[in-house]
């Protein structure tokens, strides 16, 4: 059985992580906030993409359906509300949560 990984992507790093992991023996679910973001995610049989903003309830339902072993938060550095919600929901659901964080740039 392959590892099931949820990537909440909102940065280039999230997209690149999905591309790297797509070649491994894993099942990926990538969530993004927009249709444009979804269009940037690699198209492979082991990668599913959901373009929808998720609140607490939406994240909990997503976890119940996908059943990830690991959740990686690769959202934008300024998306503090999304990060806190994801961390809290993962803790409640018993899903390992990791934050992939790049420093914000002056242009952002």
Regions picked out by a protein language model, each given a short descriptive name:
Residues 1-28, 79-83:
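A short, flexible N-terminal coil/short beta segment enriched in small residues
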Residues 8-11, 32-34, 52, 74-75, ...:
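Fold-independent oxyanion-binding glycine-rich loops
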Residues 29-53, 108:
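N-terminal beta-loop-helix "entrance" segment that forms/cooperates
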Residues 56-57:
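Structural motif corresponding to alpha-helix initiation and N-cap regions
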Residues 60-108:
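Glycine/small-residue-rich loop that forms an oxyanion/phosphate-binding "nest" at active or ligand-binding sites
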Residues 12, 16, 20-21, 39, ...:
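N-terminal glycine-rich FAD/FM-binding segment characteristic of electron-transfer flavoproteins
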Residues 23-39, 88-103:
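Short, compositionally biased "basic patch" segments
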Residues 20-23, 43-46, 85-88:
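Short, glycine/charged-enriched secondary-structure capping and boundary segments
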């Amino acid at each position: 059985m392959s590892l099931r990984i949820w990537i909440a992507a909102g940065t280039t790093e999230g997209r690149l992580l999905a591309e790297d992991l797509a070649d491994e023996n894993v099942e990926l679910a990538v969530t993004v906030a927009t249709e444009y973001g979804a269009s940037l995610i690699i198209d492979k049989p082991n990668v599913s993409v959901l373009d929808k903003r998720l609140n607490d309830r939406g994240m909990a339902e997503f976890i119940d359906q996908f059943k990830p072993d690991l959740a990686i938060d690769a959202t934008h550095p300024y998306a503090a509300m999304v990060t806190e919600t994801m961390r809290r929901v993962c803790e409640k659901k018993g899903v390992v949560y990791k934050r992939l964080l790049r420093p914000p740039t002056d242009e952002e």
